[in-house]
Amino acid sequence: GTIKELLAAYPGQLRVVFRHFPLDQACNPLLKRPVHENACAAARAAVCAAGRGQFWALAEKLFAGNTDPEDLLAARRELHLDDAEQTACAARPATAAVVAADIAACSQAGITAVPVFLINGRPLRGARPLAEFRRLIDQELQLAR
């Protein structure tokens, strides 16, 4: 997707930090109504996949809309992630704490919806064309020179 394309276009110039902000009341107390059921489980699964170097691979599958339990299990298996290990990891309080800390960081940054991309602190809200990302990145790179 967009992040892969940007990393390829700007080798060694970008640092990507992902913060979880699941739109699911099961773990996100900032939501007033349900939006994406199973998003909290998906966020915990992504944290666990990161521990095996598979964060982006799993995230790509999850962002394609595959967050129900059966699809999540199939995605983990497709990536050769051990079911028992991943299930145990997702159930750990430390894993939930990672997601909770990300939600808190997003809240402090004023983020209330996703996706939001911060480029040197400048927000780009919602799905945007690649050209818009490039324009903002190029501006920031010029300022850094």
Question: What does each of the following model-derived ranges do?
Answer:
Residues 1-10, 14, 65, 70-145:
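C-terminal cap of thioredoxin/glutaredoxin-like
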Residues 1-77, 143:
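Structural alpha/beta surface segment adjacent to cysteine/selenocysteine redox centers
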